[in-house]
Amino acid sequence: MAEAHQAVAFQFTVTPEGVDFQLSREVLKHIYLSVIRSWKKRLIRIKNGILRGVYPGSPTSWLVVVMATAGSSYYNVDISMGLVYYIQRWLPEGRPYRTPYTRTLFSMAIFSTGVWMMGIFFFRQTLKLLLSYHGWMFELHGQTSHLTRVWAVCVRLLSGRRPMLYSFQTSLPKLPVPSVPATVHRYLESVEHLLDDEQYYRMETLAKEFEEKTAPRLQKYLVLKSWWATNYVSDWWEEYVYLRGRNPIVVNSNYYVMDLVLVKNTDVQAARLGNAVHAMITYRRKLDREEIKPVMALGLVPMCSYQMERMFNTTRIPGKDTDVLQHLPDSRHVAVYHKGRFFKVWLYEGSRLLKPRDLEMQFQRILDDPSPPQPGEERLAALTAGGRVEWAQARQAFFSSGKNKAALDAIERAAFFVALDEESHHYDPEDEASLSLYGKALLHGNCYNRWFDKSFTLISFKNGQLGLNTEHAWADAPIIGHLWEFVLGTDSFHLGYTETGHCLGKPNPVLPPPQRLQWDIPKQCQAVIESSYQVAKALADDVELYCFQFLPFGKGLIKKCRTSPDAFVQIALQLAHFRDRGKFCLTYEASMTRMFREGRTETVRSCTRESTAFVQAMVQGRHLNEDLQRLFRKAAEKHQNMYRLAMTGAGIDRHLFCLYVVSKYLGVESPFLAEVLSEPWRLSTSQIAQFQIRMFDPNKYPKHLGAGGGFGPVADDGYGVSYMIAGENTIFFHVSSKFSSSETNAQRFGNQIRQALLDIANLFQVPKADG
């Protein structure tokens, strides 16, 4: 389609007089504008680096200190206690210090700058110390202590005004290393009710032997690492949990995010995509300029923002032993897949970001292009869905030179990947299966219409519905959720559409069309592609996904029960699982540790002794409501306490994981660690964050709700459950399992979740919403 329009900076022809160069003014103009844009970005980064480096100080505060020093000198008050005079003596003779007056001014400026820098250092260290206090998390709602109130005032005073995205990074405390006895004790407490007496005695013996003999040496190395590393967990977690995994990342690692499902802005596929891509690049520009406000817990405690750095221009590159994340400082295009063809779409005209209407025109050109796929091109992306070793070998053998390398570079160096699907998906409340089919399309598609290695793939369906498929190694779900909230809010409330559903404005018809990527894929490579496709297809076909909207109530009713919404849902999941399987199991709930620098996640083992006691009492059906309420509140309090411990660095699993990594480096065998890390998570759960950005008033626009997202089951005979408490009156659930397991059924478990929520709510006899 676009071969004839490929831009070249110059052409040359051989004549009798020699070689005649013909420079293209248009291309040189674009090169010039590109250089200008690149330098502008560098200058912005330098400026932001300086402002970030002196935060919470500012040029204004520096000027105040200088003026205070000069003013005191005017009134013959030496607040420097002779230091200004001492500095003046050491200034070299001659220019620019020729007169005593200029020497004095320079001395005052140097002294003031030193005082200013010392103040910044003091404020930062004090703020870091204050942010290490987590007592506020363990206080009952509405019962704030005097200590916490004083702490909050101090944090607010030291946090400065108008912080940039990364302003607090150096003030965040490091993730603390828990003590081995505390971790072992909490671990044994988490499994005691899941094991019989003989199994528990055996595990207790292994734990005691580990604690006394093996752990002290491992702990010393781990503490040593925590001293010099920014975070003692995150780099190993990224490498060993994600990048060293050799299994396919589709279903096993990548997750999906859904669009708004109760409102629709347009049915025009290219228009919706044009607005979304424009909003994403606008977000990237804000990200580069650090104009995005850091996420603050309670509007007071900053969360770590480092994961956002690799949101765009990032690709997971396969390797034989381990993958690597390739992140580029900038990218001016997106890669697009449609009907088996790959395209390169430029996002800028010179230094100007294309308007939504221009982007709509470019995507419509791709939709209208009738050209067929090249041999081997249609299913090429299946390589990213198959085994990692096979992909690494194929990449080295067939994509390391020539046009294949150039085309692959265009994809891997893109800002992100776009999939233009030919089918339609949406949520129809009257059709229960519609949400599940939508989720399946986002999770794996047809296994070759997503580039699973990109940081994220933006998926556009024929009816204008959108969604994301996200690679997991570079960041966790709240990070991509932050971007998605911005995109959906910008699309609905800032960009808008015409009455006919197109983007606002007029397109620029002289824009060169998208560039078709060229491939030369030999038969041997096509065989590898087909093999990877069959592997991925078997995985995808085995996934049973059941997504549903729970309408009877949401967090509004749960709050009336005077309990945490997350604890309420987690206990309901335990009740549902016991009814479904007739037994309890290790349960994984993801929590975050972003109150610490470069923190990612920690595990909450939410199947507790207290929750099992409540479930057993519910199932027996012989207890009074008052007794059941008491057991429920006890279970909810235990869950909340465990969640708080995980968030404040006192979790179990990341500590044991790191001790295991140290043991492998040292060649030390630990039966206890080997057994703990091989235990299957048959119920893996996660709550989806929302309203991280206030783009609109949810009370005024209650139907502007996304349905969250989901992931595949972690264990072959287990369930994966994600949920989003989407408002006062609704909860979305995404339940996954495998068809190949005779013990699990996603829809059956989803129905058990529904009933468990209703049964627990009935204990409190609180009226439910209609629906």
UniProtKB/Swiss-Prot annotation:
InterPro entries linked: Carn_acyl_trans, CAT-like_dom_sf, Cho/carn_acyl_trans, Cho/carn_acyl_trans_2, CPT_N
Entry function: Catalyzes the transfer of the acyl group of long-chain fatty acid-CoA conjugates onto carnitine, an essential step for the mitochondrial uptake of long-chain fatty acids and their subsequent beta-oxidation in the mitochondrion.
Residues passing through the membrane, by range: 48-73, 102-121
Gene Ontology biological process terms in this record: carnitine metabolic process; fatty acid beta-oxidation; fatty acid metabolic process; long-chain fatty acid transport; response to blue light
UniProt: (R)-carnitine binding residues: 588, 601
Protein location: Mitochondrion outer membrane
Ranges in the topological domain labelled Mitochondrial intermembrane: 74-101
Bilayer topology term: Multi-pass membrane protein
Pathway of action: Lipid metabolism; fatty acid beta-oxidation
EC number(s) on file: 2.3.1.21
UniProt protein name: Carnitine O-palmitoyltransferase 1, muscle isoform
Enzyme class: transferase
UniProt record similarity statement: Belongs to the carnitine/choline acetyltransferase family.
One matching Pfam family: CPT_N
Keywords tagged on the record: Acyltransferase, Fatty acid metabolism, Lipid metabolism, Membrane, Mitochondrion, Mitochondrion outer membrane, Transferase, Transmembrane, Transmembrane helix, Transport
Residues that, per the record, bind CoA: 554-566
Reactions it catalyzes: (R)-carnitine + hexadecanoyl-CoA = O-hexadecanoyl-(R)-carnitine + CoA
UniProt topological domain (Cytoplasmic) ranges: 1-47, 122-771
